[in-house]
Amino acid sequence: MEQYQEAIEKFKEALKQQPENAEIWCSWGVALVELQQYQEAVEKFEKALEVKPDFVPALYGCGFALTAIGRKEEASEKFKKAKEIAPDNAAEST
């Protein structure tokens, strides 16, 4: 768990220099998922998607986090969009 907290601190620092970096926002979301902080993770994935709307890793991450907090309809939309963008990379969303 400590490594995720350390990573989050590094993401915060990196975003001061690159606030429009979708990959960093997405990585922060992944770290929050690992810490089971799903609502915060959704916020970070959504920020990544504001920067880069078709960023498949953020769509899947957001879908997973939304599922974890019971927002299954919204999650389904994220998975659907990801599958439309990258049908060959579609993860199982059930």
Regions found by a protein language model. Give the residues of each.
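Register position in tetratricopeptide repeats
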Residues: 34-35, 68
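Conserved structural position within tetratricopeptide repeats
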Residues: 9, 13-16, 46-50, 81-84
